[in-house]
């Protein structure tokens, strides 16, 4: 049975930097830098310009990952795309990324499957686990795994929405997962969900139980109320469950491998809130040098946080071959996951 290892990483963030002060100055939100930093650790985030979507961000990260993997794009056997902000209701962003990469064009055209994963902040680990299983089955050799988001198109940029909107930014990260006979790669993964909390963090922009699923007036023009248009969150419940589930699932992947936190060289936590990660770090007594974070620069890019962190760590030299890496995420659903790998 082949193993699945990360052969290449890539990332991309939009050029526009939106600071905490910009939220107040440009959008009139009643907030300030100190208020946001104290609660989240976030100092700035990136916003994509008008006309740029999730697959547009993803193609840059994907091309970087493919190049760093040392393969041709036509060597890919599958795309697994994690996002909560696809271009449209359907089709998914995976086929748009396939289109933008030109995989179906020219004499080397290859019509590989493109799968979208909708598991929000846990999406990348759900996607990575899916790709790992496909490789271990022998069905594929190279899988492009992407996490990308364009949050800025759906944020309530008013004082009413400041608690949620100040958290999120746009960005994309990607890895190429490849088959190998070497003793390396993804050693174990674990996923979980608790649907009892499905409404605790949600964006209910439509309700498919209603006819039509978006209310319309007598002229057929859609009418969407703010509580439906924008994400709603019970922050205290999210914080409590995130801490418990992230710690729990981390031990669930380490224990069967006879590993402890002392064996891990780098912890890559989803970047939802710096205070969540600091609480976990303190609880588990993880040294600062074993942690990576970028939430202060990018905010929460949901499915993109972990692959961006991996790519930046490789780029900076902090993540090197042979290191043991633990990845952990928690998100809406509630969903969560963890994976441990030999880099």
Can you name each region flagged by the protein language model?
Residues 1-50, 161-240, 244, 248, ...:
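Condensing-enzyme catalytic core mediating Claisen C-C bond formation in acyl metabolism
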Residues 7, 82, 118, 143-149, ...:
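Short beta-strand segments
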Residues 30-56, 84-143, 148, 282-310:
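Conserved catalytic cysteine-centered active-site region
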Residues 61-77, 248-265, 313, 317-318:
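Phosphate/pyrophosphate-binding loops at sites that engage ATP/ADP/AMP, CoA/4′-phosphopantetheine
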Residues 77-84, 267-268, 294:
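Short glycine-rich or small-residue beta-strand-to-loop segments that form or flank ligand, phosphate
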Residues 136-171:
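Flexible, glycine-rich active-site loops centered on histidine and acidic residues
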Residues 242-247, 261, 265-283:
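Active-site pocket-lining segment
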Residues 308-328, 334-343:
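Catalytic phosphate/nucleotide-handling subdomain of diverse soluble enzymes
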């Amino acid at each position: 049975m082949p193993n699945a290892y990360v052969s290449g990483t890539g990332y991309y963030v939009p050029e526009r930097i939106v600071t905490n002060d910009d939220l107040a100055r440009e959008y009139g939100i009643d907030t300030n830098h100190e208020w946001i930093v104290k609660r989240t650790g976030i100092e700035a985030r990136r916003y994509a310009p008008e006309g740029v979507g999730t697959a547009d961000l993803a193609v840059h990260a994907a091309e970087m990952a493919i190049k760093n993997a040392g393969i041709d794009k036509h060597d890919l056997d599958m795309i697994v795309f994690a996002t909560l902000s696809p271009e449209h209701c359907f089709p998914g962003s995976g086929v748009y990324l396939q289109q933008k990469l030109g995989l179906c064009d020219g004499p080397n055209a290859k019509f590989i499957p493109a799968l979208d994963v909708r598991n929000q902040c846990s999406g990348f680990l759900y996607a990575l686990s899916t790709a790992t299983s496909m490789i271990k089955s022998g069905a594929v050799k190279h899988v492009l795994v992407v996490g990308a988001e364009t949050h800025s198109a759906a944020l309530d940029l008013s004082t009413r929405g400041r608690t949620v909107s100040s958290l999120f930014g746009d960005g994309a990260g990607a890895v190429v997962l490849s088959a190998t006979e070497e003793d390396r790669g993804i050693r174990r993964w674990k996923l979980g969900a608790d649907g009892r909390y499905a409404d605790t963090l949600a964006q209910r922009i439509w309700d498919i139980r209603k006819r039509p699923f978006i209310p319309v007036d007598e002229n057929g023009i859609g009418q969407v109320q703010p509580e439906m248009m924008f994400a709603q969150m019970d922050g205290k419940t999210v914080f409590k469950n995130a801490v418990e589930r992230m710690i729990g699932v981390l031990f669930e992947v380490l224990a069967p491998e006879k590993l402890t936190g002392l064996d891990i060289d780098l912890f890559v936590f989803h970047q939802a809130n710096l205070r969540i990660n600091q609480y976990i770090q303190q609880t588990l007594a993880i040294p600062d040098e074993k942690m990576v974070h970028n939430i202060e620069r990018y905010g929460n890019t949901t499915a993109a946080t972990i692959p961006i962190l991996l790519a930046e760590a490789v780029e900076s030299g902090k993540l090197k071959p042979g290191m043991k890496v633990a990845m952990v995420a928690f998100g809406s659903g509630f969903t969560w996951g963890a994976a441990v790998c030999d880099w």
